[in-house]
């Protein structure tokens, strides 16, 4: 859409940001690459100032479908996050990702003959979602009050490794490809 698999744009007081999420291996879970999380951290730090609020987009929901969703939530919860929007299940459903208000939305071709899209309206205090089928009027499917007072997520990963004597583990983030380049 914006020529990259990461995007950021500003509309009024909103910083709208999105990043790709795998799977990067055949039949793997959804995954956000470390370089994308790094980009998200630095982008939000640079862009979210002076009363700006954040709307986040990606494909997978902020739950266990995304193997490192906790890392993503930990970045977002540092900012006044209005909502996270995702697809994946091709249906409308409100849920919480950590303490972040999230909304799953439809696909373009939800079911045969039901072509359309989602309209999201962000006001000063609310977020409203509408199902817009082609050649029909939008229908409100969900709305919620904006609450940017986020309680930090408490869930953690086990990051300890049994390293054999004489070896070390070092994280290196050099991959810039957005897909697994070979199978």
Language-model segments: which ranges?
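Extended active-site neighborhood of metal-dependent phosphoesterases/phosphodiesterases
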Residues: 1-45, 49-50, 71-83, 93-106, ...
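Binuclear metal-dependent phosphoesterase catalytic core
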Residues: 9, 93, 97-176
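Active-site beta-loop-alpha junctions enriched in small/polar residues
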Residues: 21-22, 59-61, 108, 134
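Short acidic, glycine-rich surface-loop motifs adjacent to enzyme active sites
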Residues: 44-64
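Histidine-centered catalytic micro-motifs
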Residues: 56-61, 82-92
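Acidic-and-aromatic substrate-binding clefts and catalytic sites of carbohydrate-active enzymes
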Residues: 62-67, 110-112
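Short, conserved clusters of charged catalytic residues that mark active-site
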Residues: 67-71, 87
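Aromatic/hydrophobic beta-strand junction motif of beta-rich domains
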Residues: 179-183
């Amino acid at each position: 859409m914006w020529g990259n698999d990461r995007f950021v744009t500003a509309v009024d007081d909103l910083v709208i940001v999105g990043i790709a999420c795998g799977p990067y291996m055949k039949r793997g879970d959804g995954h956000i690459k470390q370089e994308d999380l790094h980009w998200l951290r630095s982008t939000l730090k640079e862009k979210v100032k002076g009363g700006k609020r954040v709307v986040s987009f990606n494909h997978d929901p902020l739950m266990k479908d995304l193997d490192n969703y906790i890392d993503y939530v930990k970045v977002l919860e540092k900012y006044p996050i209005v909502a996270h929007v995702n697809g994946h299940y091709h249906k409308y459903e409100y849920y919480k990702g950590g303490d972040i208000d999230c909304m799953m939305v439809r696909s373009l071709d939800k079911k045969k003959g039901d072509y359309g899209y989602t309209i999201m309206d962000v006001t000063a205090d609310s977020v409203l979602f509408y199902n817009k089928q082609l050649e029909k009027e939008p229908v409100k499917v969900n709305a919620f009050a904006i609450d940017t007072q986020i309680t930090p997520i408490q869930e953690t990963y086990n990051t300890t490794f049994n390293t054999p004597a004489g070896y070390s583990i070092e994280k290196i983030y050099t991959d810039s490809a957005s897909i697994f380049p070979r199978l």
